[in-house]
Regions:
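Catalytic core regions of nucleotide second-messenger enzymes
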Residues: 42, 71-85, 114, 118
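Nucleotide second-messenger and two-component phosphorelay signaling modules
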Residues: 2, 13, 28-39, 75-78, ...
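Amphipathic alpha-helical regulatory segments at dimerization interfaces
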Residues: 29, 70-73, 139-143
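Conserved long alpha-helical elements within nucleotide-processing catalytic cores of c-di-GMP signaling
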Residues: 5-35, 41-45, 49-53, 57-65, ...
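Catalytic strand-loop-helix junctions within cyclic-nucleotide turnover domains
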Residues: 51-60, 77-80, 85-102, 127-128, ...
Length: 161
C-alpha cells in the first residue's frame, strides 16, 4: 500500500486540481519504476496498491525503500512543491492467506509508518497494532476537539474544479 503523506493538506492549500497532479505524478512514477509484470492500482483517494509476484518481503525491501525516497513534486504558481509517500507491505501467505487480509496487513504497516513520522517504508510484522488506523483517527479527533477556534482557510483558484 502506498499513500501520499499529508494529501489533505495538498488539497486544502493548493486546491483539488493540484492534489490530482500529485496523484498523477505518483502513478506515472510507479509505472516507470516498477517492472511490467507488477500489478499497479489505485485503491481510492490517495492510496495505491502494488502486487509484486513471486517474491518475499526480503526480496522487495530495498526496491520499495528506494521508491519511497524518490523525489516527487508538482508546480503551483510557478514554484516546485515536494511531497512524500509512505509505504506498507505484506507477504502472501506468510502474513495472510486471503487478499483482503493481506491488504489489511499492508495497511497496518502503512499506518505504523505514518505514526512514526511518515516518508518511510515498512513490512508488516506480527504484533503491529491492527487498530492503528482507528487510533490515528481518534488522535486527529482529539486534536480537532481540543483546538477551539482552529480552522482551515481554503481559497479556490482558477485551476481548481
Amino acid at each position: 500500500m502506498i499513500d501520499i503523506d499529508d494529501f489533505k493538506t495538498i488539497n486544502d492549500m493548493y486546491g483539488h486540481a493540484y492534489g490530482d497532479v500529485a496523484l498523477k505524478v505518483l502513478s506515472e512514477g510507479m509505472q516507470k519504476f516498477f517492472d511490467k509484470n507488477v500489478l499497479l492500482g489505485r485503491n481510492g483517494g490517495d492510496e495505491f496498491c502494488i502486487f509484486l509476484p513471486d517474491c518475499t518481503c526480503a526480496d522487495v525491501k530495498e526496491k520499495l525503500e528506494k521508491f519511497t525516497k524518490l523525489k516527487r513534486s508538482f508546480k503551483y504558481e510557478g514554484e516546485e512543491h515536494q511531497f512524500t509517500i509512505s509505504v506498507g507491505y505484506a507477504e502472501y501467505p506468510v502474513h495472510a492467506d486471503k487478499p483482503s487480509k493481506l491488504m489489511r496487513c499492508a495497511d497496518t504497516a502503512l499506518y505504523e509508518v505514518k505514526l512514526r513520522g511518515k516518508n518511510g517504508c515498512m513490512a508488516y510484522k506480527n504484533g503491529l497494532r491492527k487498530d492503528i488506523r482507528t487510533q490515528l483517527g481518534f488522535a486527529l479527533k482529539d486534536v480537532s476537539e481540543n483546538l477551539p477556534g482552529a480552522f482551515i482557510i481554503y481559497k479556490a483558484d482558477n485551476n481548481d474544479d
